[in-house]
């Protein structure tokens, strides 16, 4: 994958602003461990390049983001609605980022996982870019992975 942190920063800020009305600002890095409950949305890229795009957010922020998407109160949302919303956020980010990748390429449907002390791993891939953002007092992560040759 050949996407820069500048491209990721622009795409994430635009998706959060346009879809959710939430300002997401890049931060240099985070010492924040994935403690507590996190939600991870993963989109796979295939074609001229192969890899994955993973968006990981703390559950309370995921609930707020979903509430913004559905114009609802955070407490009124089911876990399924929160996962659907975060899958769609990852889909929008991946859809925009794929345009910066060699063509032809395609993206998968999102896979969404939730768990305590969650750490997402995609076998056969290496991290090529890890970016952190701050929004509404929370920090979240967007990671790009490249499929290793022969994997």
Task: Write out the residue ranges for each language-model feature.
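N-terminal auxiliary interaction/assembly segments of multi-subunit proteins
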Residues: 1-151
